[in-house]
């Protein structure tokens, strides 16, 4: 019984290893000071890429005014 529990534990641990390559899109998003959302980005954020192995969305703050609309004094 102990051996079968041990083998079962080894099997589960080998199945649920974290893949460091699978989260590269999430790391890239967070390094750009963006946010990762599972569902659609809120209206005040723009989607710029993906997160969580393509299952989420990388959202960035919108630019409310373009530089061409700013009046210089």
Curated annotation (Swiss-Prot):
Residues 1-23 form the signal peptide. Disulfide bonds join 29-58, 36-51, 41-59. Coiled coil: none annotated. One of its GO terms (cellular component) is extracellular region. GO terms for biological process: defense response to bacterium. The keyword Signal applies. It comes from the Eukaryota. Only expressed in epididymis (corpus, cauda and caput). Keywords: Antibiotic, Antimicrobial, Defensin, Disulfide bond, Secreted, Signal. It holds the Pfam family Defensin_beta. PANTHER family: BETA-DEFENSIN 40, BETA-DEFENSIN-RELATED. Belongs to the beta-defensin family. Has antibacterial activity. This is Beta-defensin 40. It comes from Mus musculus (Mouse). The gene is Defb40.
């Amino acid at each position: 019984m102990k051996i079968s529990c041990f083998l079962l534990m080894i099997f589960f641990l080998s199945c649920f290893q974290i893949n460091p390559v699978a989260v590269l899109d999430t790391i890239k998003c967070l390094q750009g000071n963006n946010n990762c959302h599972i569902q659609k980005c809120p209206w005040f954020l723009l989607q710029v890429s993906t997160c969580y192995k393509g299952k989420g969305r990388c959202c960035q703050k919108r630019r409310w005014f373009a530089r061409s609309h700013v009046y210089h004094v």
